[in-house]
């Protein structure tokens, strides 16, 4: 099996390629330098010339807050880029795995979201990932994997942000009224590599066990790091909050168990 993995410089793409290497599965990782996903011609050239058995599409615009000010660019990456890859996968009749987000839901209610619940994104980022889902769903061979609150050794994430702000400021304000499941890309990559070797196409939710608020997550980060940082819990209406998104975007991952 030979796989193409986009977004290899990000935390998930990096770990997926490593997991493939550990299993002696050939995986070619590309980033914007090797294949700009917004360039349809380049996407076609790279995928068609590689003789790949499947494409794992990790590359994405993930800066949620910045997306509100950069709608066109976020759409170009998350929607147009996804379409470019999907078109070639459909033409070659090879599977495509697309990573989406819990932010395709509005976060209302008290229960965790299931795979085929109605989608209603509240922000630009969630909307573009939803539109990407609609594109990928048209492929006969597709995996849509919704993930949440991911963190890993490579790339940027909430843990690294908290550690940086803790050192710079000594105090942070973090929302305590948004609940989710922090998910380690090392664990996620194992599931992804297992899944891509099957023909069990469809939509999946993939997160680690357990739920917490961003505030609880931040407190645990500083505890594990042995840092003395003042963490103030605030709600999402607070002007100095780090996160401003759906209240309860947490997703039910029982299908993948």
Regions found by a protein language model. Give the residues of each.
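N-terminal Rossmann NAD(P)H-binding glycine-rich loop of SDR-like oxidoreductase domains
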Residues: 3-20
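Rossmann-fold scaffold of SDR-type NAD(P)-dependent oxidoreductases
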Residues: 6, 52-58, 98, 205
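NAD(P)-dependent short-chain dehydrogenase/reductase
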Residues: 134-180, 186-187, 194
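Mid/C-terminal beta-alpha module of Rossmann-like enzyme folds, strongest
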Residues: 191, 198-242
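Catalytic helix-loop patch of NAD(P)-dependent Rossmann-fold dehydrogenases
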Residues: 76, 80-84, 91, 104-145, ...
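C-terminal amphipathic/interface module of NAD(P)-dependent oxidoreductases
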Residues: 229, 247-257
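NAD(P)H-binding glycine-rich loop region in Rossmannoid oxidoreductase-like domains
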Residues: 40-77, 88
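Adenosine-cofactor binding site in Rossmann-like domains, unifying the SAM/SAH pocket
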Residues: 21-45
């Amino acid at each position: 099996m030979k796989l193409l993995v986009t977004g290899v410089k990000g935390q998930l793409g990096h770990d997926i390629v490593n997991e493939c290497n550990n299993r002696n599965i050939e995986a070619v990782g590309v980033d914007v330098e090797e294949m700009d996903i917004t360039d349809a011609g380049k996407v076609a050239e790279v995928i068609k010339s590689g003789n790949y058995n499947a494409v794992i599409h990790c590359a994405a615009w993930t800066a949620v807050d910045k997306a509100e000010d950069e709608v066109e660019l976020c759409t170009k990456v998350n929607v147009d880029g996804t379409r470019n890859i999907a078109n070639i996968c459909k033409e070659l009749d090879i599977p495509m795995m697309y990573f989406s987000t819990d932010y395709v839901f509005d976060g209302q209610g008290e229960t965790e979201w299931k795979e085929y619940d109605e989608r209603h994104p509240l922000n630009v980022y969630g909307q573009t990932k939803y539109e990407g889902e609609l594109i990928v769903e048209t492929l006969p061979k597709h995996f849509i994997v919704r993930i949440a609150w991911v963190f890993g050794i490579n790339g940027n994430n909430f843990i690294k942000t908290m550690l940086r702000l803790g050192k710079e400021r000594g105090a942070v304000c973090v929302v305590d009224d948004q609940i989710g499941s922090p998910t380690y890309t090392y664990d996620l990559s194992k599931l992804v590599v297992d899944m891509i070797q099957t023909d069990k196409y469809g939509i999946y939710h993939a997160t680690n066990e357990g739920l917490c608020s961003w505030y609880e997550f931040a407190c645990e980060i500083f505890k594990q790091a042995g840092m003395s940082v003042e963490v103030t819990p605030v709600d999402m209406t607070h002007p100095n909050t780090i996160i401003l998104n759906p209240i309860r975007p947490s997703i039910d991952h029982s299908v993948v168990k």
